[in-house]
Design a protein with these regions (language model features):
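Short hydrophobic core segments
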Residues: 7-9, 32, 131, 150-167, ...
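An anion/pyrophosphate-binding glycine-rich loop and adjacent beta-alpha core
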Residues: 36-38, 43-44, 52-53, 58-59, ...
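Glycine-rich FAD pyrophosphate-binding loop
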Residues: 23-47
Length: 395
């Protein structure tokens, strides 16, 4: 049976960086990956462009419960260190509205430079290794696969991800091993995910995109707000604006106690209410047909979608509806459509300095398996790289 200093479970963004970090520290390393290839989720990041970092990065862009842990990690391996790490691997980058991308605009470039470094360091990768059991003894950790392969190691780095995009490798199957060592799992719910809505407007405007101001309403109170693109779908709402506020909605809809969740949309954020009302009043007085009242303000199809409202020829009523349209959220879409996981291993049980378990010596965590969620825009990959590098500094 082969023995290693450290076994990294999971060959995603955090696991690959953890393995490189650990190997550079002169340790014997093995990567265990259940899929037939590595980095599949990384290849899908940013629509294949891989927004791997953000120009503005600190703990304030992450969930409140994780901020202390994130702050500690970034103080040791933050934006400057992440960029230097990839530059030394040969990856060139550029910044677009604060989001950092490889100059190739290909996620495969990010994965490839990591693969080249892993090969240079002679780090073995066991693909198709689905972990079935982890047993701890005085001699170390015995890791067994579903095919009855076994390895023994002194340290384990759990980098197996959360539950989003299970077809790409992260399905939450390693949470059970975390629990077996006493760790508490914050219930995982999908995040950066489309929302299902029951509203005829969504069906009528299916496929339409529009720039809006969107807010999440949880139990009648505004929780979050963003500006961005809204996309109407056959099942409800999607687009960047919805994905950005979906964490609050998902927690309310999927965790007990389940709370009423709504989406409040301003379809004309470029006009204040008084100006919109005045514009509509002028058009009504000028004899505009109801179907044409929104021409030049909203896409043409909106006239048909809101025709009953427009027929009222009441500028105040129309303005209120367009500036404060409320959609009742029924449910989130499933894990196959979620970009991130909200939830995971409770960060209060993890050492801020080393990312080692406070409950089990020589057990480390990194990446999305932890209850750490950043905003969209490169923050989650930044966490993956930072936490992976630090977890790899095992003693």
């Amino acid at each position: 049976m082969q023995r290693f200093h450290t076994a990294v479970i999971g060959a995603g963004a955090s696991g690959l960086v953890a393995a490189i970090s650990a190997k550079r520290a002169k340790n014997t390393i093995i990567i265990l990956e259940r899929l037939p290839s590595i980095g599949k989720k990384l290849l899908a990041c940013g629509g294949g462009r891989c927004n791997f970092l953000n120009d503005k990065i600190d703990e304030s862009y992450y969930n409140l419960s994780a901020r202390s842990l994130v702050k500690s990690a970034f103080s040791r391996f933050g934006k400057i260190e992440i960029l230097r790490f990839f530059e030394e691997l040969g990856l060139h980058h550029y910044c677009e509205q604060g989001r950092i991308f490889p100059v190739t605009n290909q996620a495969s470039s990010v994965l490839k430079v990591l693969e080249i470094e892993i090969k240079r360091l002679s780090i073995p990768i066991e693909i198709g290794f689905e972990v079935a059991d982890i047993v701890s003894s005085r001699e170390g950790f015995l890791v067994s696969s579903s095919a009855n392969k076994k390895i023994i190691c002194d340290n384990i780095i759990l980098a197996a991800g959360g539950r989003s995009y299970p077809a790409l490798g992260s399905d939450g199957s390693c949470y059970k091993f975390c629990r077996s060592f006493g760790h508490r799992i914050i219930e995982a719910v999908p995040s950066a995910v489309p929302i299902e809505i029951s509203d005829k407007t969504c069906h009528f405007l299916q496929g339409q995109k529009i720039f809006v101001c969107a807010k999440s309403l949880i139990d009648g109170k505004i929780n979050s707000e963003t500006r961005g693109e809204l996309l109407f779908t056959k099942y409800g709402l999607s687009g960047t604006a919805i994905l950005d506020i979906s964490q609050d909605l998902s927690v309310a809809l999927n965790r007990e106690p389940r709370l009423p969740a709504q989406v409040l949309v301003d379809f004309a954020p470029f006009l204040d209410e008084a100006d919109l009302k005045s514009e509509l009043s002028s058009r009504i007085k000028a004899g505009f047909e109801p179907l044409d009242l929104l021409c030049g303000i909203l896409p043409n199809k909106f006239g048909s979608a809101f025709l009953d409202l427009l027929k009222s020829k009441d500028p105040g009523k129309i303005t209120t509806e367009l500036k404060h349209k409320i959609f009742k959220a029924l449910r989130t879409r499933g894990w196959n459509e979620a970009e991130f996981t909200c939830g995971g291993v409770d960060t209060s049980q993890i050492s801020e300095k080393s990312l080692e378990s406070k409950l089990k010596k020589k057990l480390y965590f990194c990446g999305e398996i932890l209850d750490v969620e950043g905003r969209r825009g490169g923050y989650n990959l930044a966490w993956a790289f930072s936490s992976g590098f630090i977890a790899g500094l095992t003693e």
